[in-house]
Amino acid sequence: MRKTVKRESEATGGKREADDEPEKLRSVKKEKQRKTEADSVRPDEPPPPQEEEQGISDRRILRSKYLSLQNEINDCKDDLMKIDSDKFSRIINAVENLHQQVRKPREQIADAEALLDIANTLMSSVKSQSAHGVSPAEFVNALISGFGQGSLGIDTDETAQVSLKWKDLGFAVCSTVLVSCGCSTMLGPMDTELKQRKRAPNRKRTKPGEGVRPDEVDDSQSEEKTDTDKNMTIMFNILGKKKRVQLENLVLNRRSFAQTVENLFALSFLAKDGRVEIIVDKSGSHFAMPRNAPDANVVMSGEVIYNHFVFRLDFKDWKLMSEMVPLGEELMPHRQTAVASSSCPAASAPASADFTQDTQTTPIRKLSRNRGLVVQEETVVEDTPDKEGDGTRRRCKRRLTSS
């Protein structure tokens, strides 16, 4: 009996497995159909909504938090370097949390100022520790030796309390705080009288003249490009050839700090127009790459928004940048500034030679206050024809009279 029951159970189990197999196949097919339908529907769905921009009130609250954090840094600057204090780690964590909320350049500046305050505070504390000054223990020992009550011998207990002569200490310090601050304002006269306003004279009104229509000026000629536009064109052509360059190599001009700033302005305008993309790699280096500028219709519709970047650069940073960038790897060329007074030196040389040949020197008497009657030679230029025969040159004839 047991064998027959087992065989029947095995037979029924095999039938159940055979019945379950087509059901599993059907469920797998349905899941595949659902996935294909979902993939076909995804392109038609609208893109996920982007993060809404921060409001004015949120940005104001963020800047106020940065301001309170800077005040806290200035207040507890003495406790940042203590071993048993956790203020440094707490402030750094607070700055990092606020940095995650920064979206605009104004808040980026506040974030950079907070980090700069922390760095300056740590540097000043390190300098104060390295300097050889009076420690608090030495100051207290000097007070006890000068104004302490009781004998300070070798046999005295270290745990014994020492009292000070506060009256003598006050008299000693009194000379430095004798000056009291009073009222430094000045009161005006008490008998002020009301001044009568002078009556302004009436001006005669002139009748308007006849209307005149100005001549229209032909604006067909294209406007000349400014220096900034030329720098932008040169920089974009360099980026088009190199495709990916470091920011320092693109901006730096080793010979001129002013031209480095001009290159930085040109890069900022290219980034604003969407023609340059600035990225940061894992090591923290900045790279610039060219991009195609968006169409005007896309900008007007609001799909594309102009962005700016903040770059702090002073003379010390320029010196450091010139040391970091290897010599000869600067990409922007040096621009020569033209000076009007030094132009055409070769053309002015023969003219000056002709002028010296045609001039005559005549003694002229002048009366000087310090030396009396003085004889001074002056040049008198007369009208002479041109030697080359191209025409006559007009030269002024100067007459000098003596009093």
Swiss-Prot record:
Interacts with SMC5, SMC6A or SMC6B. The SMC5-SMC6 complex is composed of the SMC5 and SMC6 heterodimer attached via their hinge domain and from the non-SMC subunit NSE4A or NSE4B. Expressed in seedlings, rosette leaves and floral buds. Component of the SMC5-SMC6 complex, that promotes sister chromatid alignment after DNA damage and facilitates double-stranded DNA breaks (DSBs) repair via homologous recombination between sister chromatids. It holds the Pfam family Nse4_C. This is Non-structural maintenance of chromosomes element 4 homolog A. The keyword Nucleus applies. Residues 342-353 have a biased composition (Low complexity). Residues 1-57, 194-226, 342-403 are annotated as: Disordered. One of its GO terms (biological process) is DNA recombination. Residues 1-45, 384-393 have a biased composition (Basic and acidic residues). It comes from Arabidopsis thaliana (Mouse-ear cress). Residues 196-206, 394-403 have a biased composition (Basic residues). It comes from the Eukaryota. One of its GO terms (cellular component) is Smc5-Smc6 complex. Residues 354-363 have a biased composition (Polar residues). Belongs to the NSE4 family. Keywords: DNA damage, DNA recombination, DNA repair, Nucleus. InterPro entries: Nse4/EID, Nse4_C. It is found in: Nucleus. Disulfide bonds: none annotated.
